[in-house]
A protein has these predicted regions:
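Charged docking surfaces used in two-component/phosphorelay signaling
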Residues: 187-268
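N-terminal Rossmann-like NAD(P) cofactor-binding subdomain of oxidoreductases
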Residues: 1-205, 237, 265
Length: 268
């Protein structure tokens, strides 16, 4: 790519926004040119806005330190500076849905880390190795939004990204029942041990909302586009327990699968 795409980060001062900035440092395709956050951060440099709340293991990239934070609600102004945005905003689901579609309607593609649009029927939730064909639904979404270029696309819940690709590879053996237990790091809650010391040497055996996501979202990944919307698959039946563990980064999953056509060890 001869010229990098100009990227904006919505919700740039939060932990997920910081992760985007860290991962995109020196990226061969993308350059972070705009950071946007709440009105209380707007007008400050990114370094000033984040202050002592930088939570990444690596230092804050020099390229973003002096970027002036823009008000996330000044949609037209933010959109005019970028080719597309990554969304990591921390709002209610209805607010997230609304503001992401506002950006899309300015002809700015939105790639969202949030769960708000994961069940919007014409919004693709994609793991490229599993369901790249779901990007085709974007054309129907554009018609609904009245856009030529703008759209919203989302990623699935982090807890399923380890085992959903494996289950996809085993579809020929017709899995019909899946029991999974996920052991999820505190970074998934936007925390570090510094601001959540209670998690040291501790386990929380239930994470509100995570079980439903882990049980339903794989079915959407395996769904099909019909009449301009994504219709989720109905099998396998997935049962999941989600446990918060005292680990800073990285999730683990223990997954048990029943097949209608039992594979051999070699086939697996």
């Amino acid at each position: 790519m001869s010229e990098k795409l100009k990227v904006g980060i919505l919700g740039a001062t939060g932990m997920v926004g910081q992760r985007f900035i860290s991962l995109l440092e020196n990226h061969p395709w993308f350059e972070v040119v705009t950071v946007a956050a709440s009105p209380r951060s707007a007008g400050k440099t990114y370094e000033e806005a984040v202050g002592g709340r930088w939570k990444m293991d690596t230092p804050m990239p020099e390229a973003v330190k002096k970027l002036v934070v823009m008000d996330i609600h000044e949609v037209e102004k933010v959109a005019a500076t970028v080719d597309f945005v990554f969304s990591a905003v921390d709002m209610t689901k209805d607010e997230i849905k609304a503001i992401e579609e506002e950006y899309a309607k300015t002809e700015t593609p939105v790639v969202s880390n949030n769960s708000a649009h994961r069940w919007t029927p014409d919004v693709p939730m994609v793991v490229p190795e599993i369901n790249p064909e779901h990007f085709d639904v974007i054309e129907f979404q554009k018609k609904r939004l009245g856009t030529k270029r703008g759209f919203v696309a989302v990623k699935p819940n982090c807890s399923i990204q380890s085992y959903a690709p494996v289950l996809t590879a085993w579809k020929e053996f017709e899995p019909y029942e899946v029991v999974a237990t996920t052991y999820q790091a505190i970074s998934g809650a936007g925390k570090t041990f510094k601001d959540w010391p209670e998690m040291e040497h501790n386990i929380i055996p239930y994470i509100g909302g995570e079980e439903e996501k882990s049980e339903k979202e794989p079915l959407r990944l395996w769904g099909k586009i019909e009449d301009g919307v994504i219709v989720p698959a109905t099998t396998p039946v997935i049962t999941c327990q989600c446990v918060r563990v005292p680990v800073l980064n990285g999730h683990t999953a223990a997954v048990f699968v029943k097949f209608r056509k039992n594979p051999t060890k070699e086939q697996l």
